[in-house]
């Protein structure tokens, strides 16, 4: 190959995917999201793979693959690799840092996790900083840094008072510490602000049982069952009601 022709070929490769390829990748990415919403992880994985065939540098597709690996297939090492690949492609990708952080935390690496949460929070463009703050708070608490952990959780909720995950985790921590009054307040807010979430009413019901509030527990278990509509998520609520008979 002549030097001039080789230079032209290299220049063409350096430009990356064409506009058509980028559009194709975007379409497959959107189809993957639809598959995830329908509870079809294998279909989602196939669409993410097609997105990456069209655009190998699509960080969102790698993060999506990570979510499928972690939550759909339980393949945690593969999920970690995908999150890291997404970050490699886009170092300021806050959502990928947060997802990697929560995976590191759940696999017993809280110190590494906190670094990832801090990376997520370093970006002014992160759309959901309260999520990383809540996750960081839980990691700090798990490390034995109780005050720091609770401070992060409160900071999370000061930013997003209606964040269901934050209310849940703070409420459960307080419950486990034996602070029933404070726990009931947090879990009550969780159930009120996240009324359509089955778990919110389950957690409140169980806390009310611990507090000896039988009538309140029964009402929460009944609301939980009403929302579950026969799904497996309502089994714990059904068992709770049976205990109150």
Task: Enumerate the language-model features and the residues they cover.
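Bacterial Sec signal peptide processing site at the extreme N-terminus
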Residues: 13-30
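Structural marker of alpha-solenoid helical repeat scaffolds
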Residues: 20, 54, 89, 123-125, ...
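Canonical tetratricopeptide repeat
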Residues: 30, 64, 99, 135, ...
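Residue-level recognition of tetratricopeptide repeat
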Residues: 33, 67-68, 102, 138, ...
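Position-specific recognition of the canonical hydrophobic site in helix A of tetratricopeptide repeat
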Residues: 36, 63, 70-71, 98, ...
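Structural signature of tandem alpha-helical TPR/SEL1-like repeats
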Residues: 38-47, 72-85, 107-119, 143-155, ...
């Amino acid at each position: 190959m002549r030097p001039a022709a080789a230079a032209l070929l290299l220049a063409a490769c350096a430009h990356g995917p064409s506009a058509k390829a980028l559009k194709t990748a975007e379409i497959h990415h959107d189809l993957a999201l639809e598959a995830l919403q329908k509870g079809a992880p294998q279909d989602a994985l196939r669409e993410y793979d097609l997105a990456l065939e069209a655009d190998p540098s699509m960080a969102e597709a790698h993060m999506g693959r990570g979510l499928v690996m972690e939550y759909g297939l339980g393949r945690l090492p593969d999920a970690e690799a995908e999150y890291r690949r997404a970050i490699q492609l886009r170092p300021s990708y806050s959502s990928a840092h947060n997802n990697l952080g929560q995976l590191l935390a759940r696999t017993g690496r809280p110190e590494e996790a906190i670094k990832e949460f801090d990376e997520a929070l370093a970006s002014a463009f992160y759309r959901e900083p309260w999520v990383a703050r809540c996750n960081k708070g839980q990691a700090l608490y798990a490390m034995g840094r109780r005050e720091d952990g609770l401070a992060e959780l409160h900071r999370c909720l000061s930013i997003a008072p209606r964040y269901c995950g934050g209310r849940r985790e703070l409420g459960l921590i307080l419950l486990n510490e034996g602070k029933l009054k404070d726990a009931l307040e947090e879990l009550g807010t969780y159930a009120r602000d996240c009324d359509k979430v089955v778990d919110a009413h389950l957690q409140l019901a169980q806390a009310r049982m611990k507090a000896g509030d039988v009538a309140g527990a029964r009402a929460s278990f009944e609301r939980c069952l009403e929302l579950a509509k026969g799904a497996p998520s309502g089994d714990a609520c059904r068992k709770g009601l049976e205990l109150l008979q």
